[in-house]
Amino acid sequence: MRIWIDADACPKAAKDLIVKFALKRKLEVVMVAGQAVAKPAFAVVRLIVVPSGMDAADDYLVEHAVPGELVICSDVPLADRLIKKGVAALDPRGREFDERNMGDRLAVRNLFTELREQGQAGGGQGPYGEREKQAFANALDRILARLAKG
């Protein structure tokens, strides 16, 4: 089984946790990015830099990840495409994407996109701290255990 990472937007602390879990469970990690990013120096980690272009990394992830694998991403439309393909998706803050919550997640994402475009909302998510790391570690452990059972 592989853990895929949308590496352009994934916090370093989350990447470090993924590598730790992968080493412990003997899993492969594939980081996909639209530009060169720092790759942890472990044999289980591979970095793929896709040609630049709108959604090139997303398209690569959707094309190559298969059911039974996990993709770590913050991108809600990407997660929707993965879920429809039967691939598990988790954001770096520990929130799993699934068929039940995708509609709400897409609606909220679209609303905030509109508000930002109108200048009524700014910024993004808050800092990635210990609470977020712990929530991510717990969710990652739970999902990997579920995927290992098949």
Swiss-Prot record:
Residues forming coiled coils: none
CDD domains: PIN_YqxD-like (cd18720)
Domain of life: Bacteria
Stored Pfam families: DUF188
Cystine pairs: none
InterPro entries according to UniProt: UPF0178
Similarity comment: Belongs to the UPF0178 family.
NCBIfam families (alphabetical): PRK00124.1
Protein name per Swiss-Prot or TrEMBL: UPF0178 protein PputW619_5044
Species assigned in the record: Pseudomonas putida (strain W619)
Phylogenetic placement of the source organism: Bacteria, Pseudomonadati, Pseudomonadota, Gammaproteobacteria, Pseudomonadales
